[in-house]
């Protein structure tokens, strides 16, 4: 009898099979591989359930360009927390060349600046998504929703400010152009994905423990509707104050949230791997 692979090797093989041919059936010898993105993904598994012993697993997933979109979540011009504003500025500068290259390669770009979408009502990119026929989303999957590994109950600001609505638009460094669309409504975005045959979302922006997880267009709800999400983990940040549990640095708090997402919601990837995978 042939030996079966065990443990993590079996898990990796299973993950590769799941992600093989995302978005469309694969016809061997007939697919145009130049229009696939082969991305290095990271997830976390608990081989012995209930043990609390989580293992990092790295694997590759293949994403057809025409069934993949980037969602830019809440990358505003200003945040009520000055520390968050400063970190978002750094993220925006990193995002811009990647977004521009992805757009040029045929990846759909979705701008999702919550609370300020009305500013863009006359933009063709906003009008485009408003013209999409409504597609009813399926019943949401009943998935576990464990608590976060950090305490963000005070808003998570590490520079002392109190909440006010500071944002007025998406960060101006990020271009809105071409075939992009603008929406911060999960049902609008789901209808757009359904019409375009998009099954995979690469999600970047802020904040990992709040909007990235909880917006109607973001990881939790899209996953519950059967959309395959991937967090771009080096293009996100958290709202976490090191004065709160578990009393680690801000960056360590962000990493804990990323690991939580990998454990319970979706894989993550690096922006550098996406840049490398994009057709040149």
How would you label these PLM feature ranges?
Residues 9-21:
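Bacterial N-terminal signal peptides
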Residues 75, 111-114, 233:
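A cross-domain feature marking catalytic cores of carbohydrate-active enzymes
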Residues 94:
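Short catalytic helix/loop segments, enriched in acidic residues and glycine
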Residues 1-6:
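N-terminal secretory signal peptides that target proteins for export/translocation
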Residues 121:
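Carbohydrate-interacting regions of secretory-pathway proteins
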Residues 23, 29-30:
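Boundary at the C-terminal end of the N-terminal hydrophobic targeting segment
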Residues 68-83:
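Acidic/histidine-rich, surface-exposed loop or edge segments in extracytoplasmic proteins
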Residues 30-69, 86-88, 97, 104-106, ...:
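Active-site-adjacent betaalpha module
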